[in-house]
């Protein structure tokens, strides 16, 4: 299926509505808190220079970003426990230098009810404040938003992590290792300057063993490239 035809199936087609999702507003937003795990797989060589606030390995960047909410509460009545979000993104040059913007698309967990769907779009759209309000400033174009079955898995010992939307996105990685890596230990970076989930984090590095995208007008396949897993803990507004 072509990207053009596929866009006909997304929930929100009008680009102005997609962009409106990422316009900052925190009026009448309830208190919220979510925590869980995030990872990406990307086009860059290992380790991805973007995590160190540098330009991508090959000049441009293509990636899958996946979030799993272990614990989440939006307002007094809406639990977000166990829900997933998946993003696709591309850009050219250093995203942290302020001279480029991300072209993106987002999928939200189809098992979310109406209240949960609204909360997810508020939080991940940056309209509910918190870290994602800052992250949203990096986005220049939204190609589409949709709800889909998102499978997210991460090993307890961080030996592997993966996310999948059947027929659209596959992102699987294994923990980076080498001859000097002690058994069971992980290769980590403390306080990465280009962290995608906020300051003060710990990134665990991995190698993408499967990275394939054909959705929302994005199409690529990059195996054997960079990946990283980072826990997140956000509050708002």
Where are these regions (language model features)?
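Cationic, low-complexity basic patches in intrinsically disordered or flexible, solvent-exposed regions
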Residues: 7
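N-terminal ordered "arm"
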Residues: 27-74
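Structured domain cores in non-transmembrane regions
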Residues: 69-137
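Charged linear interaction tracts used for macromolecular binding and regulation
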Residues: 108-181
């Amino acid at each position: 299926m072509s990207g053009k035809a596929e866009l006909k199936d997304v929930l929100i087609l009008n680009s102005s509505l997609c962009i409106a999702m990422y316009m900052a507003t925190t009026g009448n937003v309830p208190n919220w808190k979510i925590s869980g795990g995030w990872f990406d797989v990307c086009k860059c060589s290992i380790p991805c220079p973007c995590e160190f606030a540098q330009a991508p390995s090959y000049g441009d960047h293509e990636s899958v970003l996946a979030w799993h909410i272990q614990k989440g509460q939006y307002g007094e009545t809406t639990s977000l426990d166990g829900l997933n979000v998946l993003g696709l993104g591309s850009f050219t040059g250093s995203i942290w230098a302020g001279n480029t913007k991300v072209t993106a698309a987002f999928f939200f967990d189809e098992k979310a009810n109406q209240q949960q769907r609204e909360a997810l779009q508020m939080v991940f759209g940056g309209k509910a404040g918190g870290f994602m309000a800052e992250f949203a400033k990096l986005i220049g174009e939204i190609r589409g938003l949709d709800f889909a079955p998102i499978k997210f898995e991460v090993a307890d010992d961080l030996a592997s992590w993966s996310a999948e939307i059947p027929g659209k996105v596959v992102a699987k990685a294994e923990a980076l290792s080498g001859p000097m890596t002690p058994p069971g230990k992980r290769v980590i970076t403390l306080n990465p300057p280009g962290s995608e989930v906020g300051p003060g984090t710990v990134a665990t590095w991995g190698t993408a063993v499967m990275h394939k995208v054909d959705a929302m007008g994005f199409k690529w396949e990059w195996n054997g490239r960079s990946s990283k897993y980072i826990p997140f803990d956000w509050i708002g507004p």
